Amino acid sequence: KDIEKSLNALSQIVALENPTIKEFPEKKMKCAVVEMNGIALEFLEDNSEDGFLAKFNRKKGDAIHHFCLLSDDMEKDVAALRQKGIPMLDLEPRIGLRGKKIAFTAPDALRGISIELSEP
């Protein structure tokens, strides 16, 4: 809900350099990426009334929405998941906030948490 509060809470646990918070006015979203020991954590704030994160936050509060796995071949990996019967929100890869191809599984694929596939 509040990207600054989330980053501040994390900084109480681990040393963080002030990450850049990027604004995407056309999507009514903010995004910050924190990299630690080879892991990237992406924090999102949805300031719309009907965006997917706004709906998620109303339903579940502040919680992990998804985690991301990197893919060197998005089309192949999306097709493989679909062939295994994994429900997908994105039947084909699309361009995400960072300008990379992404695709999400449906939340019910992993007990309420989506998996995002993304180009590196």
Kindly give the residue locations of the regions a language model identified.
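Short, composition-biased local secondary-structure segments
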Residues: 1-5, 45-50
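N-terminal beta-strand motif that seeds the catalytic metal site of vicinal oxygen chelate
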Residues: 1-8, 62-71
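Conserved active-site tyrosine of GNAT-family acetyltransferases
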Residues: 6-11, 81
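A short secondary-structure junction signal
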Residues: 8-9, 45, 116
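A cross-kingdom feature marking solvent-exposed beta-strand/loop segments within repeated
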Residues: 11-29, 47-65, 84-102
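Vicinal oxygen chelate
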Residues: 22, 32-35, 41-42, 69, ...
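Short, charged/polar surface micro-motifs in flexible loops or helix N-caps
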Residues: 37-41, 48-50, 74
